[in-house]
From Swiss-Prot:
Protein's GO biological process: immune response
InterPro entries per the UniProt record, alphabetical: KAAG1
SS bond partners: none
Listed name of the protein: Kidney-associated antigen 1
Expression tissues: Expressed in testis and kidney, and, at lower levels, in urinary bladder and liver. Expressed by a high proportion of tumors of various histologic origin, including melanomas, sarcomas and colorectal carcinomas.
Biased composition annotated in UniProt, kind: Polar residues: 75-84
Signal peptide per UniProt: none
Positions of region (Disordered): 31-84
Family annotation (Pfam families): KAAG1
Domain of life: Eukaryota
Length: 84
């Protein structure tokens, strides 16, 4: 049996118990325990430099798929049109 196993409740999957145990380990107990928190990521200095980064170069977006452009000659695109 694991040393860090949470007490089991019949019919509850093991993963649920492990998740509950993990959440319990992350909680801070009592005043002055703020240093026990896990470090935030990204650190504030790194997060600030990311916000100030220049935007990526804008590439024109293609609105049409690959291949030939559609025909513009009405006679070719609509066979029901007859010459006058």
């Amino acid at each position: 049996m694991d040393d860090d196993a949470a007490p089991r409740v019949e019919g509850v999957p093991v993963a649920v118990h492990k998740h509950a145990l993990h959440d319990g380990l992350r909680q801070v107990a009592g005043p002055g325990a703020a240093a026990a928190h896990l470090p935030r990521w990204p650190p504030p200095q790194l997060a600030a430099s990311r916000r100030e980064a220049p935007p990526l170069s804008q590439r024109p977006h293609r609105t049409q798929g690959a291949g030939s452009p559609p025909e513009t000659n009405e006679k070719l695109t609509n066979p029901q049109v007859k010459e006058k």
